[in-house]
Amino acid sequence: MPFALLCFFSLFSAVSVYASPFKTIGLVSAWDPEMKALKRAVLAPGANVRNTEIDGTVFSEVQQRGRRLVIWMSGVSMINAAMSTQLAIDHFHPDAILFSGIAGGLDPSFQPGDVVIPERWIHQAEAAWLNRDPERSGSYVIPEYFRPRYPNFGNIFPDDVWVVRKGDTTPHRVHAFAMDPNLFDAARVTAPKVSIRRPDGSKANVVIGGIGMSGPIFLDDRSFRDFAFQKWHARIHEMEGTAIAQVGYSNRVPILIVRGLSDLAGGQRGVNQEERNTQLAASNAAEVTAEIVEQIESAQ
């Protein structure tokens, strides 16, 4: 179709022009299965890797296709992710950071094995927990300092986070952290090239766009899953992405987060199958991430 081809070549051109400043690319995963899959997918055979330990985190550097890759394992959950990302920015000055790992699916159309690359990321646990109003059934006692802005989940009222950016000294309110548009365009171009499978052997989807949600909680609860999708329009949930997105936003470093679905975050029947699907989900995310990195590396 001519229009589709025109869109494809327009995106390819934009990515090629913009990607060239990405001389140093940070690549991060949270834990061992994700990290092994990422290195297996991204590193060329026989790559000459130089390891540097900083405050307990090991950073692996390699020169590949004229780019410097800096790879590290953040550790699981929000604070670990934020701390290690700031370490990487302070010591290695990456021009862009990509995360590869697993997540739980909130969107009912998703299945384990699918890969999702959200365009925006929100906090799950940035909220006020309020008392019930004893005089009004179904209501809560709202403090004078707090103004509800978003639908609540029982007594939990989500709120924005206040952030200071590099080059500024005034905190401002942020609801969602957007991914870098040029990295996001690179994902649009390269993702369809990847052939990945679900646990049952059927073709897995690579979904671009929507909202991702992060919090310091392993989500395996159907009621919150339904609420997050219906009210916040969040499509996946995990434990690091928004923290990394916020650190990137504060430092003005482009970010992209790629997630393979290991489970349905409580939407399944019976016991959660995250452990059974981890290897496949991590590998699928890493394969998509590797294609995006290759697109950046090959740009002139």
Task: Enumerate the language-model features and the residues they cover.
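Bacterial N-terminal signal peptides
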Residues: 2-14
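Gly/serine-rich nucleotide phosphate-binding loop at the start of the catalytic core
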Residues: 25-33, 38
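A short, Lys/Arg-enriched amphipathic alpha-helix followed by its capping loop at the start of a domain
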Residues: 38-45, 64-65
